[in-house]
Amino acid sequence: MSVQNHSKLLIVDDLPDNLRALDALIRDDQRLVFHAHSGDEALALLLEHEFALAILDVQMPGMDGFELAELMRGTERTRNIPIVFVSAAGRELNY
């Protein structure tokens, strides 16, 4: 399959370990996976490429995933990109 026919996926997370883990889950021969470490970095990639899916970390310093999604939805070029929100934040559960 030529590179032109690959689906482009964007993963946005400020933690390199999370980027690697998500990449390992979704990468295959028919996908090109792009990484961004911040909302600003993601916006630059969104202007350059047409993505089939964006996976956004909810909690990042600066622009969080929800703010990035709001900007994406407000722009014609990116408003129809499906978004998946992820978070590595844990919480103590008292059962």
Spans of model-derived segments:
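Receiver (REC) domain active-site loop signature in two-component systems and cognate sites
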Residues: M60
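Active-site beta3 strand of CheY-like receiver
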Residues: H49-I55
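Receiver (REC) domain alpha4 helix and immediately following alpha4-beta5 loop
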Residues: N94-Y95
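Two-component/phosphorelay signaling modules centered on CheY-like receiver
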Residues: P16-F34
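Conserved Asp/Asn-Gly motif in the active-site loop of CheY-like receiver
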Residues: A36-D40
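Short, conserved "switch-loop" micro-motifs in signal-transduction and mechanochemical regulators
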Residues: T75, A89-G90
